[in-house]
Structure formats: structure tokens, C-alpha cells
């Protein structure tokens, strides 16, 4: 597979990072070939000042950053042999590793959503005592909003099959209104489905006069924290510490995709 840098303050746009089932193909700092590629920051900033040293042999690929209070491994890409797929996972250092939501995605208890400068924390009610019910079946939804302009508000929604919970800018009739110019009129929609549980979708749908449905994507995206192992798909986009990457699954390498 390959990562391409499509936006960054520190890496050259168009930089391509190639990974196979053993790890980073070229220039690995760890050089372990264990199927895992660790991306992160070693604590030495662009001015060669030390923030907090993290040994380079813990990393495969170094992400240059001007300053970071918690250097170390930001995220990993790992090849899972028995599933013949790659996964992405945030490793709790840096400023978070977020996947861009292109289609509907499942929400899990304690999911973190980023839109504009706002963060939404997702929690399910405790009506169902089954701890394995991480997708919130038969549970109501609580959303906590974290942003300087929105005063950490909380919202609670009862499960109601196929009813849209609209999240977007203020004064546009949304269920959650956010005062942030980086956010679209309707930035994303959350919906409960009796079969799938709680789902989130970027943008909104408009029904045209001819009955067709037009998809309206948000301007700056809806992003979900990769707090669990997320299967990497072709053309998937994710961001980590002011870098945005596009994934490509390349046919014809020494493994089958």
C-alpha cells in the first residue's frame, strides 16, 4: 500500500510512503520488518531544540513538528496476515489520528468526532447493561461538545429509527448548532438504525424534484478518531498532527490485496 501526502505544514505535498506486509519499504528507523509501521515524533523540533526525547528506534517514519508536548508514536499501520488487510490505529500521542468519513460509519461508545475546530464525544446510555453492546443498540445517545465557542454543551437524543440528528452551523435549524466558520450549514448527520445501531454520515442528502437523491458533502469534512483498529480501504483519507494522507492499495505487489 501507499500513503500520499495531500496536505501538510512539514512534509512535501505529493510525498509517497510505501508500505508492504513487512513494514516501511525504505528508510525505516526501527528496521524491524515485523509488519508494523510506526509514525511519530522524536522530540527534536525543527529548531533542533529538545521537547521531550523519544528514542528514534521506537519509530519507523518521523513526522517533523515544530512543537509537541507528548512526542512518541502517533499512529501505526499494520498488516494483518490472516485477514490479508492493513489496519490504522491511533496510539494516544500527538493531536490525534482521524479518518475522514466518506460514507456512513458505525459510532461506538466513546467515539470522538472532529468537525472544524469542534470535537464531539459520543456516549451511549446505560439502559442495556451488556458491555459488548458498543454500537449502542437500544441505547439513547449523549453528545458532549468541546470547543471554546460552544461552552462544552451536552445533548441527549432518544433512539428513533431513521430520524436524522443534524449537526452544523448556527441559525440553520440543526439539532446541534455550532458557532464555527469552518463548519458547513449541515456538516454531518447521525441516525439510529434498528439493525445497524448508531451511524454517522458526512454532509446531508437533498431529494431532487425527479426523486433522485443528491449528496451534499461538507466543506472541510467529518473526521472520526481511529481509536480502534480501522481497516484501510483504497482512497481512504486520514489526518494526523497537521498532515493529511491519502491511502492507495496497489495491485501487483508481492501480496494479494
Whereabouts are the PLM-identified features?
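Regulatory inter-domain linker segments that are low-complexity and enriched
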Residues: 1-15, 20-21, 27, 118-197, ...
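Forkhead-associated
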Residues: 21-109, 157-241
Amino acid at each position: 500500500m501507499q500513503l500520499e501526502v495531500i496536505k501538510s505544514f512539514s512534509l512535501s505535498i505529493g510525498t509517497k510512503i510505501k508500505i508492504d506486509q513487512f513494514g516501511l519499504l525504505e528508510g525505516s528507523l526501527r528496521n524491524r520488518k515485523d509488519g508494523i509501521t510506526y509514525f511519530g515524533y522524536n522530540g527534536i523540533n525543527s529548531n533542533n531544540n529538545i521537547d521531550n526525547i523519544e528514542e528514534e528506534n521506537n519509530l519507523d517514519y518521523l513526522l517533523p513538528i515544530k512543537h509537541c508536548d507528548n512526542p512518541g508514536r502517533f499512529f501505526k499501520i499494520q498488516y494483518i496476515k490472516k485477514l490479508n488487510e492493513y489496519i490504522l490505529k491511533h496510539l494516544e500521542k500527538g493531536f490525534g489520528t482521524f479518518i475522514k468519513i466518506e460514507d456512513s460509519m458505525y459510532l461506538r461508545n466513546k467515539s470522538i468526532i472532529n468537525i472544524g475546530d469542534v470535537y464531539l464525544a459520543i456516549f451511549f446510555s446505560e439502559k442495556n447493561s451488556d458491555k459488548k453492546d458498543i454500537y449502542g443498540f437500544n441505547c439513547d445517545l449523549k453528545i458532549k461538545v468541546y470547543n471554546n465557542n460552544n461552552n462544552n454543551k451536552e445533548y441527549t437524543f432518544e433512539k428513533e429509527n431513521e430520524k436524522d440528528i443534524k449537526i452544523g452551523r448556527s441559525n440553520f435549524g440543526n439539532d446541534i448548532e455550532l458557532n464555527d466558520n469552518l463548519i458547513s450549514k449541515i456538516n454531518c448527520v447521525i441516525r439510529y438504525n434498528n439493525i445497524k445501531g448508531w451511524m454517522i454520515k458526512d454532509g446531508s442528502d437533498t431529494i431532487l424534484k425527479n426523486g433522485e437523491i443528491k449528496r451534499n458533502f461538507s466543506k472541510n469534512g467529518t473526521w472520526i478518531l481511529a481509536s480502534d483498529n480501522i481497516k484501510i480501504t483504497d482512497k481512504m483519507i486520514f489526518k494526523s498532527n497537521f498532515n493529511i494522507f491519502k491511502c492507495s492499495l496497489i495491485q501487483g505487489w508481492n501480496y494479494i490485496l
